[in-house]
């Protein structure tokens, strides 16, 4: 029996509809099917516009879209280096347990090394034990003492309004 051929390649703007489909499938898997607000124009603007905000790799199995990894650069003040944050890693159910997820992460890891980034990081839902098991098997460590914090939408606007009500901000990075 012929083993399927997997190809990992950089996504192009022509892949934007497939990327959006992957994002929606991942949201469904993560029990948040109504949380996706991203549109095709958002993906095109932020992936291929003048201010590129993310990079994306696609996995194909025998020419069919099988999964993706979407990532962006961050910075560690403690390490004094840029790093890479993997925002989304997703492999369609029909293609799981074939090495595609590992191949996608390995490709992002190779990019990190090539770009002088000494680490990758990502978030995983506590209940997603298959993913946690996979990540630990490839050498990832859980950061038990860290918690992700997020502020968005109206709470973000409320916080931003505090900068114009009596406090002075000299630059976007000032605290």
Predicted regions and their residues:
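A short beta-loop-alpha structural element at the N-terminal edge
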Residues: 7-19
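Conserved GNAT-fold acetyl-CoA-binding loop/helix
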Residues: 20-45
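A short helix-loop-beta-strand connector motif used in the catalytic cores of GNAT acetyltransferases and
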Residues: 45-58, 85
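Conserved beta-strand in the GNAT
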Residues: 58, 64-73
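A short, internal acetyl-CoA/4′-phosphopantetheine-binding micro-motif in the GNAT/acyltransferase core
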Residues: 89-96
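Conserved active-site alpha-helix within GNAT-family acetyltransferase domains
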Residues: 102, 106, 126-145, 158
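Conserved GNAT acetyl-CoA-binding A-motif
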Residues: 113-123
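Conserved beta-strand-loop-alpha-helix junction that forms the acyl-donor binding cleft
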Residues: 122-131, 150-154
């Amino acid at each position: 029996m012929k083993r399927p051929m997997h190809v990992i390649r950089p996504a192009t703007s022509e892949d934007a509809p497939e990327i959006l489909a992957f994002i929606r499938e991942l949201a469904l898997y993560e029990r948040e099917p109504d949380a996706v607000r991203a549109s095709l124009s958002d993906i095109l603007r932020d992936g291929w516009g003048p201010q590129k905000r993310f990079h994306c790799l696609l996995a194909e199995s025998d020419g069919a879209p099988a999964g993706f990894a979407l990532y962006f650069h961050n910075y560690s003040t403690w390490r004094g280096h840029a790093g890479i944050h993997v925002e989304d890693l997703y492999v369609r159910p029909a293609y799981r347990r074939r090495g595609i997820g590992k191949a996608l992460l390995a490709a992002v890891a190779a990019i990190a090394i090539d770009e002088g980034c000494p680490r990758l990081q990502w978030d995983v839902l506590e209940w997603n034990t298959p993913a946690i098991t996979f990540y630990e098997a490839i050498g990832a460590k859980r950061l038990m003492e860290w918690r992700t914090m997020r502020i968005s939408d109206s709470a973000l606007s409320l916080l931003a309004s505090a900068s114009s009500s009596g406090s002075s901000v000299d630059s976007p990075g000032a605290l």
